[in-house]
Amino acid sequence: MSSSSDFRMVAKTFFGLEDVLCAELLKLGAKNIKKGVRNVSFVGDKGFLYKCNLSLRTAIKILKPITAFKIKTNKELYSSFNNFPWEKYISVESSFSIESVLISEFFSHSLFFSQKAKDGIVDRFRKLYKKRPNIDSINPEIKLNLHLRNNICTVSLDSSGNPLNQRGYRLQTNIAPINEVLAAGIIQLSGWKFDCDFLDPMCGSGTFLIEAAMIAINYPPNLQRNHFLFKNWQDFDPKLFEIIKKSISSKISSLDVKIYGYDNSLASVEKSIINIKKAGLENKIIVKKNDFFVTNKEHNNKLQIIFNPPYGERIPIDFNSFYKRIGDTLKQNYTNSVACIITSNLEALKHVGLRHKRRIKLFNGKLESRMVSYEIYEGSKKNKY
């Protein structure tokens, strides 16, 4: 049941991760959870907003809707923003920016829409205070998110600022590294319950390994992050924020399984080690230079494998034969394992030659991809396409 201090929030995410985000929110204690497309809305209080920014693994950012306008014309656009009491949210001494998303027959140019809204806001400040806040599109203190669907414009405060996938640990990257939010979502979609060892056999800069370790020990992904835009809000409560941080930190647990990775590139191994150390997980993750195709499973116990095979410019090879080698290696050397592959090369994926247990549509950046899960057991049958 909601209290008077509760308000609605919206967590943005990637396509295909909405259910994972719902589950995360439910576990954190969110109320009135409603799944959308690439977003989930929910209800909580100020402390819960802080908690979500620190703890959610599959959220890109957390928005706080503050008002909504009916807008069809330029005049309505200007007057709506000019008449709203922005002084409750923006100081005349501060800076702000506006980001607009339009799904409407009435407006088609997001930059024009943002500019007109900005004019209404700054003219109000000029009238009230004879001066106005600055516009800063790079590093604003306050960021407004405008979402126009048909003639309804929802205005939200962006509480996060930089996307929440920017955990702060990735100092070194390779070409086209996987997004941290997507990696965390894939790990949770895989069904891994931390009851067996975890391997990324093509670990690149170590994103899957780091996210897996943080999930396994219940380590909040943005605990070490300092920059959140809600810290610039007029109602920011630093004492409450520290209480929330202390509370979620107390729930970090120990690691009972082995998390390890291979990469055939020494440079990638070195990059992953740097990132793992930055995340403070060097005592929980092992990385070795190794060619997956000549490796064998280290033991007979169950093993969870998750990886993002190189693609596009990353390796100039015959991808069909490359994926066939992946399937052959899994079948011959990694029985009693569950292997999850995320790839945008849907044609090459057919050549893995194993019967998949699960297939989920995702997007890796702008690339339509599939997360495909295989159960590898003695005598795994070839899949017939």
Model-found features: residue ranges?
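Non-catalytic nucleic-acid substrate-recognition regions in nucleic-acid-modifying enzymes
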Residues: 2-140
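Short beta-strand/turn micro-motifs composed of small residues
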Residues: 13, 263, 343
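Short, charged/polar, Gly/Pro-enriched secondary-structure boundary elements
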Residues: 47-54, 162-165, 380-381
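A short, flexible beta-alpha/helix-coil linker loop
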Residues: 103-106, 163, 310-314
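C-terminal edge-of-domain segments
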Residues: 144-160, 372
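SAM-dependent Rossmann-like transferase core, predominantly class I methyltransferases
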Residues: 155-189
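Conserved S-adenosyl-L-methionine
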Residues: 178-297, 313, 320
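C-terminal catalytic and target-recognition region of SAM-dependent MTase-like enzymes
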Residues: 291-385
